[in-house]
């Protein structure tokens, strides 16, 4: 949710067109511009035992009205590589600080999608989403 909220904020500031960022996508949705963010498989490193991995992989599927607008959003997201963002949020009445580190952006490519209202573009991010402080 931290990553989805951050990406929604970025996209809102990047374009005047309305995009919806969410965890799942359905062709029954009437949304014309959608980015889904889902955890993806990949090599995950941990220090010991059952602690959280140092980083995760997230697949971004970008569905828009043209390949060009999907590509432009993809390029904007690709520019996050190397950035380290600390976000302060309130969760269940408590302040929390979360760290987002964007390490790698792989496989950006157009995807075939049989829904005639939208075209797609997808890529996978390797990034850290980690709670670093809680009140």
Segments (PLM) and residue ranges:
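Small/polar-rich, solvent-exposed N-terminal microdomains that initiate assembly or binding
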Residues: 1-50, 84-99, 135
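Short N-terminal helix-initiation segments at or just after the protein's N-terminus
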Residues: 1-9, 61-74, 131-135
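Short, low-complexity, polar/charged sequence segments that are solvent-exposed and flexible
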Residues: 40-43, 54-59, 79-83
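Mid-chain, well-packed structural core segment of small domains
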Residues: 66-90
